Amino acid sequence: MTLQKLLALSCLLLPMIASAHKFETDQRVPPVGIADRGELILDNDKFSYKSWNSAQLPGKVRIVQHIAGRTSAKEKNANLIEAIKAANLPHDKYQTTTIVNTDDAIPGSGMFVRSSLESNKKLYPWSQFIVDSNGIARKAWQLDEESSAIAVLDKDGRVQWAKDGALTQEEVQQVITLLHKLLSK
């Protein structure tokens, strides 16, 4: 193999190595605690925040979506979120947990990101929204900046599938099929 081919091959493989996340199949996500902001709570039409940590994930089958606080990141896996809405999953057994990294937002847009989350919490009160002002989860889970990562967890909080980046339509279908399988157990 010539040096030129070897260099080209290493350039192709480098992004795969660089974007490696810390999610391992059949393991819990690496522990994370978010005290600054944290979980968005809606109670009697009033919003507040409480500390959140990954030890709270077991109990329901769930999608954990970690996104940068920017529209481009939200759009990367919007097709999955639409598929989840269409799947009509039972709220007593399933929950979407969205962690928004406002540390990775366009400067000055944090207030708009939180306002958008509040609107979504009103529309989907059964969903869980976490505001990570310091990027703690992204760092602990070694996720790409300006991106969107998806992890499917079983009811014991163990990772069954994960990807950092935009899902293909085939992967979206794979995730929905996996959710139905996990919910039937």
List each model region and its residues.
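Thiol-/selenol-based redox modules, centered on thioredoxin-like
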Residues: 146-185
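Solvent-exposed loop/turn segments at secondary-structure junctions
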Residues: 70-72, 102-106, 134-137, 166-167
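N-terminal signal peptide c-region/cleavage motif recognized by signal peptidases
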Residues: 15-19
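Bacterial N-terminal signal peptides that target proteins for export
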Residues: 1-7
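N-terminal "domain-start" segment that seeds a small globular fold
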Residues: 21-52, 75-76
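Short active-site neighborhood of thiol/selenol oxidoreductases, capturing the structured segment around
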Residues: 46-79
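Short, internal strand/loop/helix patches
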Residues: 95-99, 111-144
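Conserved helix-turn-beta segment immediately C-terminal to the redox Cys motif
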Residues: 58, 76-98
